[in-house]
């Protein structure tokens, strides 16, 4: 890596600040012990900033985000947001960041952790080979399209409206991400839609198929209706390699698939836009939310954030060997019995604090790197 590899840490709300802090310690280990020339910065975001400035995100933070190669983000959310206009949350929160960075692809790897078998609701034989990548379209669909809003009719009734809309270029753009990933993995893509009742779903199916036929004939493509996909994720999750879905379906299915990991605290994610001069700038975050009920207690699971750092090492900083090392260290820490409260499954062993869990990963890194 060059000297210009800039990692920006943004804790955000609730437990986000705690888990990102620990992931930052891991990043510092790679800089100090592995010689990775990382420039690590921090920026404020969320309720802390809101209380000081009346805004969720300042212009300075947005400028730092634009300048970073990779952003490791914690969480946004909490009761304070309930009193804010929805438009302010859209314009100053994650949707603004996604728009500013041109993020359109959200990747969520889902795998089975043998050390957490007791937490997984599936029998091991059904999930032990699960290693899937969920590719979610992030910039379009029902979360963004217009018209939208809550209106009142002439007879006094209230009506809520949202619009599901995709064009061919948006669909092919995200399809290429899935097909490229499949080429480097098992060579299989399963595309999710609701083409039997939605015109947007029919276009999705047609364009994904056309993209595959024209550009990726070597990749196996299957189409599946979203309701059947939800069922198959419960019955045969190991059948999926790369799962491609639109914004809404991808949002829902990725959380459902996360049950394989045993805890939302184990799930990382990455979001990308177009490559910039051969570099893939990324926005990385654990899937779990801000968890205000446990914020400030030092008991949150930092592994989702730490595994998100591994994704940054792999995809933005192009250090796959270092990413593999970090993922093996997480696996080793878990195999050695390291558990935060969400990973105990009723066991008698004491729960580790957020910091102690990160310490267990650091110890595993030292052992594996020796």
Swiss-Prot record:
Question: Which residues are substrate-binding?
Answer: 98, 108, 136, 227
> InterPro entries, per this entry?
IsoCit/isopropylmalate_DH_CS, IsoPropMal-DH-like_dom, Isopropylmalate_DH
Q: Name one GO cellular component term.
A: cytosol
Enzyme class, first EC level, given as a word:
oxidoreductase
Record-level Gene Ontology MF annotations: 3-isopropylmalate dehydrogenase activity; magnesium ion binding; NAD binding
Q: How is the cofactor bound?
A: Binds 1 Mg(2+) or Mn(2+) ion per subunit.
Q: Which cofactor does it need?
A: Mg(2+); Mn(2+)
A Pfam family name for this chain? Iso_dh
Name the predominant localization.
Answer: cytoplasm
Q: Does the keyword NAD apply?
A: yes
Signal peptide interval: none
Residues binding Mg(2+) are 227, 251, 255
PROSITE patterns from the UniProt entry? IDH_IMDH
What keywords sit in the KW lines?
A: Amino-acid biosynthesis, Branched-chain amino acid biosynthesis, Cytoplasm, Leucine biosynthesis, Magnesium, Manganese, Metal-binding, NAD, Oxidoreductase
Q: Could you tell me which SUPFAM superfamilies the record lists for this protein?
A: Isocitrate/Isopropylmalate dehydrogenase-like (SSF53659)
Please list the reactions this protein catalyses.
(2R,3S)-3-isopropylmalate + NAD(+) = 4-methyl-2-oxopentanoate + CO2 + NADH
Pathway terms, separated by semicolons? Amino-acid biosynthesis; L-leucine biosynthesis; L-leucine from 3-methyl-2-oxobutanoate: step 3/4
**Which residue positions does UniProt flag as site: Important for catalysis?**
143, 194
What EC number(s) does its UniProt record assign?
A: 1.1.1.85
Could you state one GO biological process linked to this protein? Answer: L-leucine biosynthetic process
Residue sites binding NAD(+) per the record: 289-301
Q: Where in the cell is it found?
A: Cytoplasm
Could you give the subunit structure recorded for this chain? Homodimer.
Q: Which NCBIfam families match?
A: leuB
* Record-linked HAMAP family: LeuB_type1
What's the protein name? 3-isopropylmalate dehydrogenase 1
Q: Which organism is it from?
A: Bordetella bronchiseptica (strain ATCC BAA-588 / NCTC 13252 / RB50) (Alcaligenes bronchisepticus)
Q: What is the lineage of its organism?
A: Bacteria, Pseudomonadati, Pseudomonadota, Betaproteobacteria, Burkholderiales
